[in-house]
Amino acid sequence: MPPPDLELPRFLEAPLFAGHPWVYRDHVPREFRADSGTLVRIRAGSFSAFALWDAESQIALRVYSTRELPSASWVADRVRQAWELRSLVRSQETTAFRWLFGEGDGLPGVVVDLYGRFAVIALYADGLERIAEW
């Protein structure tokens, strides 16, 4: 099923084109309804992207992709790229480091810290656990 469409105020076009990763609740039409964790196609002027909807947070939308609908392989690519980017840290004799930096690694709201053989995963958006369904 295609994601729902959401038309946002045109004044958001410039900040979103500049790479701002969030849309705040105040900027979302009040009548919009979806379950948390739903991928939404957003538009603001000529800007278009796929974003993750959070029905509870003041950060209502986290922009995930301006090119394609995120999928399992899309998420795996972001995780792999973050792993490769941290190769210098991994090659040193450290036993703890941050693997995923959320928005900085293209996975808004997801932070992963490694401590030895253990990973601590923090999800900062309601419904983000649904990412596993992609």
Predicted regions and their residues:
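RNA-binding accessory domains that recognize and position tRNA/RNA substrates
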Residues: M1-W134
